[in-house]
């Protein structure tokens, strides 16, 4: 490989929530175990060097005044979308900066719904969506994803349509790839979902922040690409932050083709929160989307695919009673621990604490709307993933 995904990086004291925080009250790591961060969705790999190079090059100039996004910024996004997602016809005017995916979601829901109105989401549900809608006084209506005979998560289109009609919904969130299940939707699935939204006149916001992190053998389909109607009713959100581990630099972008949607989202973004770009974030994106970034992401996908395959097989062979669907994208596992916990007579709280006690810092999955779930991050060097599962096998699931 061209880039290093093997070295174990020491992030302590370097502004890293993943290693500085234990995300479960009352849990502690026992003496003799170091922390293996497997919770918050960022990566324990060094990012592609061109990002640092672009930032350092800009920092070496001693003025940091007001600025506008450069032509290079927009062209970097246009070229990235064309090469990675086969997007044609994208222009700078359709692209808009956002401080984050959730900031754009907040602006969109304020633009197209009123307090007290309902919005449709799928469940399991990314916890960030929940916070946005609760904070903005909107009612969340959940359409459960269901697992087929092979355990693959599927949308229930009849349930979606019924709930949209019952609650008079005109705003829907579509997460593609889906977080936390890791499902990468196929063309026909997206097409059917968009037909439901079209028939019920819903504005759709499509969170595609994970779209670069598709495991090998799968392919991301941009929601806006499945039809002309989808192109015109969808607000799509992307970001280099998830792909290149840049969450601490802040910065994402929307793609909105429909001027009616675009004008309102941009106006509301400026009203509801400070939504101006940081100059270093701009240069980070430009550095990320260079040719070297394409190579880095392709190698990362290979590493993540291997980690997921290892973890999936290990769980099937050693953690009897723990259920999971094999993810097709993201680097997260979403474990259903109900059968195991009930068989052992322990609570999910006790299981989570047992893992943390041996240094496996995993995440309570219940806030994502499944009562026996744990979420695990596999974006670490393979040696750390293997060590985590060794500890879980020896000390927790024994």
Which residues are covered by each model-predicted region?
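PLP-dependent enzyme catalytic core of the Aspartate aminotransferase-like
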Residues: 344-346, 353-398
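N-terminal small-domain helix-loop-helix segment of the aminotransferase-like
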Residues: 2-100, 107, 291, 398
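Conserved core of the PLP fold type I
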Residues: 60, 64-195, 212-213, 220-225, ...
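Conserved PLP-binding catalytic core of the aspartate aminotransferase-like
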Residues: 304-305, 318-357, 374
């Amino acid at each position: 490989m061209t880039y290093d995904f093997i070295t174990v990086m020491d992030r302590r004291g370097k502004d890293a929530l993943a290693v500085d925080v234990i995300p479960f009250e009352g849990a502690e790591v026992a003496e003799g175990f170091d922390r293996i961060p497997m919770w918050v969705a960022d990566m324990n790999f060094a990012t592609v060097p061109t990002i640092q190079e672009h930032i350092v090059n800009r920092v070496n100039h001693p003025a940091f005044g007001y600025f506008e996004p450069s032509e290079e910024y927009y062209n970097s996004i246009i070229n990235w979308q064309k090469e990675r997602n086969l997007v044609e016809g994208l222009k700078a005017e359709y692209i808009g900066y956002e401080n984050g995916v959730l900031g754009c979601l907040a602006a969109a829901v304020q633009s197209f719904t009123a307090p007290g109105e309902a919005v449709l989401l799928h469940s399991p549900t990314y916890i960030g969506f929940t916070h946005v809608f609760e904070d903005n006084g909107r009612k969340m209506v959940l359409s459960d994803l269901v697992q087929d005979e092979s355990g693959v998560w599927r949308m229930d289109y009849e349930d979606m349509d019924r709930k949209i009609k019952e609650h008079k919904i005109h705003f829907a969130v579509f997460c593609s790839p889906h977080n936390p299940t890791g499902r990468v939707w196929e063309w026909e699935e997206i097409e059917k979902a968009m037909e439901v939204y079209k028939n019920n006149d819903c504005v759709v916001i499509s969170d595609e922040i994970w779209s670069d992190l598709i495991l090998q053998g799968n392919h991301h389909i941009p929601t806006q690409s499945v039809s002309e109607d989808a192109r015109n009713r969808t607000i799509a959100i992307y970001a280099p932050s998830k792909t290149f581990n840049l969450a601490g630099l802040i910065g994402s972008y929307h793609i909105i083709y429909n001027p009616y949607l675009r004008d309102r989202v941009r106006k509301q973004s400026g009203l509801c929160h400070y939504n101006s770009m940081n100059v270093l974030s701009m240069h980070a994106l430009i550095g990320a989307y260079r040719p070297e970034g394409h190579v880095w992401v392709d190698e990362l996908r290979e590493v993540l695919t291997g980690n997921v395959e290892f973890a999936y097989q290990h769980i099937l062979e050693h953690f009897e009673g723990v259920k999971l669907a094999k993810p097709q994208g993201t680097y997260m596992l979403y474990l259903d621990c109900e059968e195991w916990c009930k068989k052992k007579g322990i609570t999910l709280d006790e299981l989570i604490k047992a893992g943390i006690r041996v240094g496996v810092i995993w995440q309570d999955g219940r806030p994502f709307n499944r009562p026996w779930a744990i979420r695990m991050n596999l974006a670490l060097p393979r040696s750390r993933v293997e060590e985590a599962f060794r500890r879980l096998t020896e000390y927790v699931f024994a």
